Amino acid sequence: MDEREKAVRLWFSMWLEKKDLGIRRLFSPNCVYVESWGPEYHGAESIRLWFEEWNTRGTVLKWDIRQFFHKGNQTVVEWFFQNQMNDGRAEVFEGMTLAAFDANGQICFLKEFGCNLNRYNPYCGGLKPQFSNEQARWF
């Protein structure tokens, strides 16, 4: 479990430092990586390409780990994330990562889930829900 937590911490630190500190060692050659909003990458080389390209367009400001859960070969990480894109857009949200590890200790599957920070009770004013005018975000 400790090795898996180190692997996740390494992955997050790569984003914070904008530096490949061993993507090909961290992810298996056949790894599948699913972002919460739709993109899917196949293989460590594809993940490395995405990492390098994304970091030309933005900066991860925070990726704080809140807690880990472990079961079998899987690890779940709860986190807080913040970025700033070069075009002025910024994102702040909470999320979770489900990661599976192979027999070599490499990540062979990773799926991210995001959660909007702007939460509210649509029934606080009565039986008819009042939903926010904010456009739904899919993290």
What are these regions (language model features)?
Residues 11, 23-24, 31, 43, ...:
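Hydrophobic pocket/interface hotspot
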Residues 52-139:
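A beta-strand edge to alpha-helix "cap/lid" segment located at domain peripheries
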Residues 1-2, 19, 34, 77, ...:
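Intrinsic disorder/low-complexity signal
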Residues 1-29, 130-139:
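Short, low-complexity N-terminal intrinsically disordered segments enriched in polar/charged residues
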Residues 3, 20-72:
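A solvent-exposed, acidic/Ser-Thr-rich amphipathic alpha-helical stretch
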Residues 11-14, 34, 83:
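Alpha-helix C-capping/helix-to-loop hinge sites
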